[in-house]
Amino acid sequence: MNITFLGTSSGVPSLTRNVSSLALKLSQSSEVWLFDCGEGTQHQIMKSNIKSSQIKKIFITHMHGDHIYGLPGLLATLGLSGNSNGIEIYGPLGLRSFISSALSSSFCKLSFPLHFVEVENFASENKILFENNKLKVNCACLKHKIPAYGYRVSEKDKPGIFDIKKAESMKIAPGPIYSKLQQGKEVLLPDGRTVNGKEFCGPPRKGESFVYCTDTVFSESAVSLSKNADLLVHESTFSQEDESMAYEKLHSTTIMAAKTALLSNTKKLIITHLSPRYTSKNSITPSDLLKEAQKVFPNTHLAKDFLVADIK
């Protein structure tokens, strides 16, 4: 799996950073899952390696405008492309009415269904939000001025590496049988032999895990959600120097984001959602924010628009 940052600014766009959005490209299918959709997201998609037609799920963290104002326009555009299977939209209470109002007020009728899932109960009761045979999604309540939620996407463990030479040495002909064996299934061969796929596979390979936390001040629930994750994307609106503002506005500093990664035993941290006050021309720059976080959690990286990062 990999992610593409479509917007990395906090609150308002800047000349170099759009407001929040991130696309997750699944490794086991052609699907793309979108996390947040600030104003201008569809323009960012057009400039990126993402195809909007592949978006099947959208996860919204909270109802502030810099995370949702791009949704109605994106959905309207997707309607023109004839997405007949529909889109699943996960998010807070009020998201459905916001989208419905925006679309109906502009006399927009979509050519595909929207399937809404309100996440509050899933977060408060620690229930799985979505699951199939390859992935599961969990969410957790964050600490912001309005209800906000973090999301975790976890791949299930994958079969071990298939030993082709062993199969060939046992005179098992290549073909669909190899696929079944790789899945660890018991297979009846044309010559009457029964073989167990587990004998041909190495140990299971650990699935990848990705966590997205914004907007929030430091939160123990974010630490729990991120436990042993391969990649944590965490908001870092303020520098440590502006910690008082972070507590006032319930956003995170660089140190809070790094502390979350450290306490959760996350392998890699990428900080995003930077305040536009930090530019290369100001006394505190984005590079300074990165250095602050790296003092606490060395494997920290700085998000920028259109950055593509592997989960592992």
From Swiss-Prot:
CDD domains: RNaseZ_ZiPD-like_MBL-fold. The keyword Nucleotidyltransferase does not apply. Keywords: Endonuclease, Hydrolase, Metal-binding, Nuclease, tRNA processing, Zinc. The active site is at 66 (proton acceptor). One of its GO terms (molecular function) is 3'-tRNA processing endoribonuclease activity. Gene3D superfamilies: Ribonuclease Z/Hydroxyacylglutathione hydrolase-like. InterPro entries: Metallo-B-lactamas, RibonucZ/Hydroxyglut_hydro, RNase_Z/BN. The keyword Hydrolase applies. Zn(2+) 2 binds at residues 66-67, 215, 273. It comes from Prochlorococcus marinus (strain MIT 9312). Pfam families: Lactamase_B_2. Belongs to the RNase Z family. Its cofactor is Zn(2+). HAMAP family: RNase_Z_BN. This is Ribonuclease Z. Binds 2 Zn(2+) ions. Its EC number is 3.1.26.11. The gene is rnz.
